[in-house]
Swiss-Prot record:
Native source species: Saccharomyces cerevisiae (strain ATCC 204508 / S288c) (Baker's yeast)
Originating gene: SHR5
Keyword annotations of the record: Endoplasmic reticulum, Membrane
Classification via PANTHER family: GOLGI AUTOANTIGEN, GOLGIN SUBFAMILY A, 7, GOLGIN SUBFAMILY A MEMBER 7_ERF4 DOMAIN-CONTAINING PROTEIN
Subunit relationships: Interacts with ERF2.
Protein name: Ras modification protein ERF4
Pfam families for the chain: Erf4
Stretch forming the signal peptide: none
Family per record: Belongs to the ERF4 family.
Keyword presence, Protein biosynthesis: no
Main localisation: endoplasmic reticulum
Membrane topology recorded in Swiss-Prot or TrEMBL: Peripheral membrane protein
Length: 237
């Protein structure tokens, strides 16, 4: 049985532990209410700020048709779940808006439009829920991110594996001749894991794939510098 002193210590440790949230989102209080008659931006109080949860599609040419009709939802990296996540990118498996420190509303995991903000008159909600919730369930997102995280872990294992490290040492001893002659053979597993991730993403985005059928596209992590796992979604209206 746990005594009261131990319980107090456990509660203190829990309260001091930082809660995870999507650090890509931010709030904004000066915006135009949807359905307002004057259609002019006004200042809102703390409880009615917009949560900016989708962003310009930087993977499309600015001014292009795709840029105009799509937005990007960013799933953040997690650094707190394992030591390896500090070296190897590992992304949150939680649907944006369901994180422990997310801003929540009365509508649960539904993306509810509240107001317009930004030059392009983009529509946002007042909670951390993003438009991605309209296309993927929490379980579907978790499955996709688990697979991506697994590919990245295996790729990192090959990068720091004996083949690659031996090749680096031999490269130093031979003045680069090793890489020129036999390096590609030993580095092949690294490229195979990278190729496997690319193939998985291509499968999701191709006809018949989960994301393609939902009108969503996953961006390869390397294109964002592995700072976030980006999903291209239709622009909310």
């Amino acid at each position: 049985m746990c005594d009261s002193h131990q319980k107090e210590e456990d509660n203190a440790n829990t309260s001091e532990r930082a809660l995870f949230f999507n650090y890509h989102e931010f709030s904004y209080s000066f915006y135009e209410d949807l359905g307002s008659e004057d259609a002019k931006p006004t200042e809102h109080d703390e409880d009615h700020k917009l949560c900016i949860t989708h962003f310009p599609n930087v993977y499309a040419a600015r001014g292009s048709a795709e840029f105009q009709v799509t937005r990007v939802v960013r799933v953040p990296r997690r650094f707190d779940e394992s030591r390896s996540s500090l070296e190897t990118p590992q992304f949150s498996t939680q649907l944006p808006g369901s994180e422990p420190a997310a801003i929540v509303g009365d509508d649960g995991t539904s993306f509810v439009r509240c107001g317009r903000y930004d030059i392009g008159d983009h529509v946002f909600g007042c909670s951390s829920v993003s438009p991605l919730s309209e296309y993927l369930s929490a379980a579907e997102l978790a499955e996709v991110v688990h697979r991506v995280n697994g590919f990245l872990l295996r790729e990192e294992g090959e990068v720091f594996g004996w083949r690659n490290l031996s090749g680096l040492l031999l490269d130093m001893l031979t003045g680069g001749l090793w890489s020129w002659v036999l390096g590609p053979l030993l580095s092949r597993p690294v490229f195979q894991e990278s190729l496997a991730l690319e193939q998985y993403v291509a499968q999701l985005n191709s006809p018949g794939g989960l994301l393609h059928e939902r009108g969503v596209r996953l961006v390869l992590p390397r294109r964002s510098g592995c700072l976030s796992l980006d999903f291209v979604v239709p622009r909310p209206k």
